[in-house]
């Protein structure tokens, strides 16, 4: 028999794998999958981190998400309706350059550690 379909309500999300500057909330975890929501306050910048062997897909619901990552000078920016792919082991940080909270839906594929906080990588990574 198959598993039942489940709905996780917004008020049922659980705090998950903290990184300074952002609030991750877990909706559910299944073998090879992590799904949740990420909120970054206006003007906030996260700490540097990566997602181990997990591939991450982000969907921007509201606000702006700016991502800096190891080995690249400058940043990429995503807006509502945009998708972002963060490859496994990619050291990065998010920021929100606007005056409104950004909201992102995350789906991660893999069974690694969800978030590994790390020290700032060597240059280049800033504009």
Predicted regions, residues:
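Histidine-centered metal-chelating micro-motifs
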Residues: 45-47, 66, 74, 84, ...
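Conserved hydrophobic/aromatic beta-strand scaffold that supports enzyme active sites
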Residues: 35-39, 57, 75, 83-85, ...
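Conserved short histidine dyad/triad with adjacent acidic residue
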Residues: 36-52, 88
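Ligand-binding loop in jelly-roll beta-barrel domains
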Residues: 79-80, 88-114
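A short, N-terminal "cap"/entry segment at the start of jelly-roll beta-barrel domains
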Residues: 1-36, 47, 116-127
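A generic "binding-loop/recognition-motif" signal
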Residues: 44, 53-54, 72, 90-91, ...
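A short beta-strand-loop-beta hairpin characteristic of the jelly-roll/cupin
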Residues: 57-80
